[in-house]
Regions:
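Extracellular carbohydrate-recognition regions
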Residues: 20-50, 200, 210
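Extracellular glycan-recognition surfaces and repeat-rich motifs
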Residues: 38-72
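Secretory/extracellular carbohydrate-interaction modules
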Residues: 68-133
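Beta-strand-rich interaction surfaces with strong enrichment in secreted/lumenal proteins
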Residues: 74-81, 142-148, 177, 189
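Short tryptophan-centered beta-strand motifs in secreted/extracellular beta-sheet-rich domains
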Residues: 88-90, 151-167
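Predominantly extracellular/luminal carbohydrate-interaction, adhesion, and secreted-enzyme modules
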Residues: 105, 181-197
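Short, aromatic/His-centered strand-loop micro-motif at the edge of beta-sheets
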Residues: 134-155
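Short, solvent-exposed beta-strand-to-loop segments that form ligand-recognition rims
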Residues: 168-188
Length: 210
């Protein structure tokens, strides 16, 4: 398992946040565009690769929920715009799960078996960045965190610029890693095992893939 040295330094030295002198990535290209996705509305460009994804009411609004409890992991890819560099955010609410209670943000996806992933888990005290290549998932960066609370909303953010990737949980920069497996692609959503998770407010600012 190849873990980013800088991710380890951030975790050990700064607990649950990054150092003040770590440069935050930003998408500044004049070619950048913004894509906001209302997850409570039907969109035929979603490809639900695995799991059971349903739109339902939650807290007075419509959300997209993954409700299957038997999948190894559930994957949904938004086959709309492809992005190279991006700043993507999504809110997730872990509802239940005994084996896993996770929510993840997929980016630079080629398809439902090849992508980068940042995920948090309400049952584990870690926040991780993965590659998934031909369906095989590998951890490439990890940080120690306080587990996201079941039943509450949390936010994942990932900023990818060239080979450098920074990932945030609830506004705290926790991962800073370089990875060249995938250069551009779609975004999507992810859960694992028996996780029942709701998602809302997916937004991407990025440069269209060339």
């Amino acid at each position: 398992m190849r873990i980013s040295f800088l991710s380890l330094v951030l975790t050990l030295a700064y607990g649950f946040g990054a150092a003040a002198d770590v440069t935050r990535l930003a998408i500044t290209s004049p070619e950048k565009i913004t894509m906001k996705e209302d997850l409570g509305k039907d969109n035929p460009k979603w490809k639900f690769v695995a799991g059971r994804w349903v739109r339902r009411a939650s807290g007075g609004r419509e959300v997209l929920a993954q409700t299957a409890e038997t999948q190894p992991w559930a994957v949904a890819i938004l086959e709309d715009r492809k992005f190279d560099d991006l700043d993507a955010t999504v809110r997730f609410r872990p509802i239940s799960g005994k084996e896993d209670a996770s929510g993840g943000l997929i980016f630079r996806a080629k398809d439902g078996r090849n992508y980068l992933l940042v995920r948090a888990n309400a049952l584990e005290s870690n926040f991780r960045l993965y590659t998934t290549v031909n369906g095989k998932r590998s951890t490439i960066a990890s940080a120690h965190v306080i587990e996201p609370t079941l039943g509450l909303w949390h936010k994942i953010r990932v900023v990818a610029k060239g080979q450098r990737i920074q990932a945030y949980l609830n506004e705290a920069l926790l991962l800073d890693h370089e990875e060249k497996t995938f250069r551009g692609g779609w975004v999507g959503l992810w859960t694992k095992a028996d996780s029942v998770t709701e998602f809302a407010d997916l937004e991407v600012i990025g440069t269209p893939a060339k």
